[in-house]
Amino acid sequence: MNQQNQKISNPQTPVPTTSEMNDRDFVNELLTTEKYMTTAYCTALHEFSHESLYQDIQSIFDESQKAQRKLYDLMFQYGWYSVEAEDSQKLQQSYQKFQQTIQQQSPYQQ
């Protein structure tokens, strides 16, 4: 099965093409901001030593991650976000290569 260059998406919901921001622009801006915020929270989580503060930021990170996913789902639903299908054979080859690398680097080899 050759799935190369196939887009996975929904029909695009039309938006006005004016110089003003439209719904797609606003949602895209929110998604970009959430991606930035989750990256920043993730970095902070790696560096916190204070447990209570760590737990607070972990909670905020989780909320931000959920918001990011909801925004992605919304954009995908309206056809404003698409992904490319990958050939299943390429996926299998990548997976096998990854498994070999893990086995070679494992300190628990038999």
From Swiss-Prot:
Residues 1-20 have a biased composition (Polar residues). Pfam families: Coat_F. Residues 1-24 are annotated as: Disordered. InterPro entries: Spore_coat_CotF-like. This is Uncharacterized protein YusN. It comes from Bacillus subtilis (strain 168). The gene is yusN.
